């Protein structure tokens, strides 16, 4: 997480936010987190699957399986083997690839949405003077993004606008264009804000920080 963006890339994202906000009274906050939830159920499920597979293999053995010719019918050894398999599976189930494999798309989408909503309030996007805050939220493990806009700007953009921006951001991240993708989406959010909330009488206070927020 700490090395995902270099200092130069962080500076580029900060500059993109500052440039976009110079044309509007709105506020744009980019944020990235390593994961949006703990997904303990994926670890439990991986352990259960490996334990059941191990149990099936042990039960099916009809010949000795150690140098002392213990058989799978010796329950004590069978229990030890199953427990070890469960522990190993639970450990493997903590890896990002396994979490993605064992967790439904719907569940991951819900978790990312909830984490983004929490961040929206934690970082004060709901407190802008005119209700013009936009959160650009990226969750790395799930490879998903969310764009949440406060009510004033959200009411003025066509349906599907945020979904399009989210799709373009995720596509850019997957194509290893993370900085360019972030900066492009920031600029396009700036265009939307500038269209509906341009600076007024030279007043354009910067209500929220421009830096990329790196969550945990």
Enumerate the language-model features and the residues they cover:
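Alpha-helical transmembrane cores and adjacent cytosolic helix/loop segments
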Residues: 2, 6, 36-43, 63-70, ...
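Cytosol-/stroma-facing membrane-proximal "stalk/adaptor" domains immediately downstream
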Residues: 164-216
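Select subsegments of transmembrane alpha-helices in polytopic membrane proteins
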Residues: 40-52
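Membrane-cytosol interface motif
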Residues: 104-123
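Short, charged cytosolic
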Residues: 4-28
